[in-house]
Amino acid sequence: MEMQVQNIFIVDDNQLMVTDLKLHLQERFGASVKISTFENGESCLKKIDKDTHIVILDYFMEGKNGLDILKSIKEINPKTDVVMLTSNEDIVLAINAFRAGAKDYVIKGASAWKKIAKIIIHIITEPIRILVREFRISKFMAVFLLTFVTMGIIVLFAMYVIN
C-alpha cells in the first residue's frame, strides 16, 4: 500500500539540532515525508493546516513556549500529532504536555532521533494496527482493505470531477 506523504514540521530555535534531525528523518523516511522547519512557534502556527500531520516541537523557545504553541496547534487542527522535544526531564512539564494533547514527550540526547523515528512509524501505521486489533484481521488483510478503500475513494472522486 502506498502511504500518504506525511507533512512534518520541526520547530526549534537550535538550527544545528533542526538540521541534524531533518537529515536523520529524510534518510530514514525518504520521499514518504515532507519536512518543514521553523525557528519559533509563531512562524509554525502561520503554516499549520489540515494537511499538517506531525509537529516535533521544542518546549523552550523565544517568544511563546512549546506548551502554548501545542495548545494553539490543537485548536487549529486537533488531528495533528505533536511530539514535544526538550532537554528538561521535569515530569510536571511532561504531564502538562500530555494533558494539552501531546502524542509523546522526548528528552533531547543521543537516542532522541531514533525515538522520534519510532514515534513517526507508530503514527503512520496506526490505521493498520486499529484494524488488526479491533476487527481481528490479519495485517495483510488490513493493508488490502485500506488500499481497496483508498482506491475506491479516488475512483469516486474522479467520477465526480469528470461529471
State what each model feature region is.
Residues 12, 58-59:
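Active-site residues of response regulator receiver
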Residues 15-36:
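Two-component/phosphorelay signaling modules centered on CheY-like receiver
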Residues 24, 115-127:
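Receiver (REC) domain switch/output surface
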Residues 37-43, 66:
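Helix N-cap/capping motif at the beta->alpha junctions
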Residues 62-63, 86, 90:
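The feature encodes the CheY-like receiver
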Residues 65-79:
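Short amphipathic alpha-helix used as the core "switch/output" element in two-component signaling
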